[in-house]
């Protein structure tokens, strides 16, 4: 049972997931710091309000308060995170696309086989 667990843990996708979770947690802290320490003060300067977005609220009654600042803070965090993930995925896709193009160019046999296939298709259509 211990050897099965070791084999499971050492599989590539489990390790990749663990690394992703750890980096994701660190990245979340970084984005929260960016929002709190840089974007929040810029918004506060522009609006003349508080530097902590979480403090922004609309008091309807003593018991009913809409904390729109906390929501705004979460929206900014989400947008920053989503944009960075988009950029990372776009970069990785570009790398994979470049590698596939290099592989296709590096294989002259594939090019010859493609030409033969096209000639055979043309011959079948002519008959």
Swiss-Prot record:
One Gene Ontology CC term in the entry: plasma membrane
Record membrane topology: Multi-pass membrane protein
Keyword Ion transport belongs to the record: yes
UniProt cross-references to Gene3D superfamilies, sorted A to Z: Large-conductance mechanosensitive channel, MscL, domain 1
Superkingdom in the source lineage: Bacteria
SUPFAM superfamilies attached to this UniProt entry: Gated mechanosensitive channel
A Pfam short name: MscL
Location in the cell: Cell membrane
Alphabetically ordered keywords of this record: Cell membrane, Ion channel, Ion transport, Membrane, Transmembrane, Transmembrane helix, Transport
Family: Belongs to the MscL family.
Physiological role: Channel that opens in response to stretch forces in the membrane lipid bilayer. May participate in the regulation of osmotic pressure changes within the cell.
Assembly behavior: Homopentamer.
HAMAP family: MscL
The name this protein goes by in its record: Large-conductance mechanosensitive channel
Organism: Leuconostoc mesenteroides subsp. mesenteroides (strain ATCC 8293 / DSM 20343 / BCRC 11652 / CCM 1803 / JCM 6124 / NCDO 523 / NBRC 100496 / NCIMB 8023 / NCTC 12954 / NRRL B-1118 / 37Y)
